[in-house]
Amino acid sequence: VMLLVDSIDNLVKWLAENVCSQIQLKLPDDYRNDTDYDVEFVNPAAFPLYTPGKDRLPPNVPAPIPSVCAQLMEGSDDLIKRQRRLQFRLCLACWNPGEHGGEIYYPRQNSAALGGYSYYRATGESAKTYTRNMNGWRDSFNFADLVLREVENAEYIAGHRLVKEQGIK
């Protein structure tokens, strides 16, 4: 049976490698969130148990958002079978106040590309446009869908067998 600390650390490492590495989300700016905001995308951080405040972040993490936090909620040990069952809650955090021109992909006909199109991002003045909107929730659900896909496709996560028959809440 793996130590609890190792189980938590291994899950956080798995999240960083298998989930966070596949998505980039907006890094918040505490002082600007309008047209003056220079949009920056980062891979989410993965944290054990709680999301630290800005003054407690590890050196390689620019902000507590975007992130996923793995919280151990419940556990049990069957001493006879030498079996442990752990329940984790994954808390996702992201931030998106609106759409910046530089994050939009535009199609361009390209007969050599799969499907006949390639895509590019706007640069220059058109990349600096900004539209405040209520679509930031889409980032949250895209992040959640990525987590669900990776969990559903895994038989083992960080050395632990997933009890798929229990489902995901």
Regions found by a protein language model. Give the residues of each.
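Short, solvent-exposed secondary-structure capping/transition elements
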Residues: 78-82, 98-103, 156-160
